[in-house]
């Protein structure tokens, strides 16, 4: 039996203090939040800090913006163990990967290349922020928590905490999918639905 497996993913990354500080900077994943859903049921959530390799020392801007400490990241899991966990969450390699924006998968691919580790996912990749923009006809992409507010809801937990953002994205995903179904063109009625055959037969007799 085919199952509908979703991984709703949010990462937080290292940030530079300025354009050239540190030199040759590229973002690395330092926090991950994942919601795994099978057939519309949440079966697992995952949250962890991840130790960056190339730029292990967090910048002041990064710590201030993400409300994260150097100690939390230093005690996080190794990138190799993190990828192992991603593989465990998608053993059949058929999960649909859902993110808010395209940066999460871009950074994951770049980090995998830097660490000489194969990219862990093979399923469909869906950018929910782009789907939201197209669905509502917005000209620009909307932030995750602003989109939640536009739906008359509030985000889950704390913004820029990876698991809280993943849970918020999952809530939004379900709301958008629900609205898409409402707007789908209904199937044309059959002749039996258009005509009450019982009444027709009564009149004939």
From Swiss-Prot:
<keyword id="KW-0479">Metal-binding</keyword>
<feature type="binding site">
    <location>
        <position position="12"/>
    </location>
    <ligand>
        <name>Mg(2+) 1</name>
    </ligand>
</feature>
<feature type="active site" description="Proton acceptor">
    <location>
        <position position="12"/>
    </location>
</feature>
<keyword id="KW-0540">Nuclease</keyword>
<keyword id="KW-0749">Sporulation</keyword>
<dbReference type="InterPro" id="IPR012337">
    <property type="entry name" value="RNaseH-like_sf"/>
</dbReference>
<keyword id="KW-0269">Exonuclease</keyword>
<keyword id="KW-0460">Magnesium</keyword>
<dbReference type="GO" id="GO:0046872">
    <property type="term" value="F:metal ion binding"/>
</dbReference>
<feature type="binding site">
    <location>
        <position position="12"/>
    </location>
    <ligand>
        <name>AMP</name>
    </ligand>
</feature>
<comment type="function">
    <text>Specifically inhibits the KinA pathway to sporulation.</text>
</comment>
<feature type="binding site">
    <location>
        <position position="10"/>
    </location>
    <ligand>
        <name>Mg(2+) 2</name>
    </ligand>
</feature>
<feature type="binding site">
    <location>
        <position position="165"/>
    </location>
    <ligand>
        <name>Mg(2+) 1</name>
    </ligand>
</feature>
<protein>
    <recommendedName>
        <fullName>Probable 3'-5' exonuclease KapD</fullName>
        <ecNumber>3.1.-.-</ecNumber>
    </recommendedName>
</protein>
<dbReference type="InterPro" id="IPR013520">
    <property type="entry name" value="Exonuclease_RNaseT/DNA_pol3"/>
</dbReference>
<dbReference type="Pfam" id="PF00929">
    <property type="entry name" value="RNase_T"/>
</dbReference>
<dbReference type="InterPro" id="IPR047201">
    <property type="entry name" value="ERI-1_3'hExo-like"/>
</dbReference>
<dbReference type="GO" id="GO:0000175">
    <property type="term" value="F:3'-5'-RNA exonuclease activity"/>
</dbReference>
<feature type="binding site">
    <location>
        <position position="160"/>
    </location>
    <ligand>
        <name>AMP</name>
    </ligand>
</feature>
<feature type="domain" description="Exonuclease">
    <location>
        <begin position="6"/>
        <end position="173"/>
    </location>
</feature>
<feature type="binding site">
    <location>
        <position position="104"/>
    </location>
    <ligand>
        <name>Mg(2+) 2</name>
    </ligand>
</feature>
<dbReference type="GO" id="GO:0030435">
    <property type="term" value="P:sporulation resulting in formation of a cellular spore"/>
</dbReference>
<keyword id="KW-0378">Hydrolase</keyword>
<dbReference type="GO" id="GO:0003676">
    <property type="term" value="F:nucleic acid binding"/>
</dbReference>
<dbReference type="InterPro" id="IPR051274">
    <property type="entry name" value="3-5_Exoribonuclease"/>
</dbReference>
<feature type="binding site">
    <location>
        <position position="10"/>
    </location>
    <ligand>
        <name>Mg(2+) 1</name>
    </ligand>
</feature>
<dbReference type="InterPro" id="IPR036397">
    <property type="entry name" value="RNaseH_sf"/>
</dbReference>
<feature type="active site" description="Proton acceptor">
    <location>
        <position position="160"/>
    </location>
</feature>
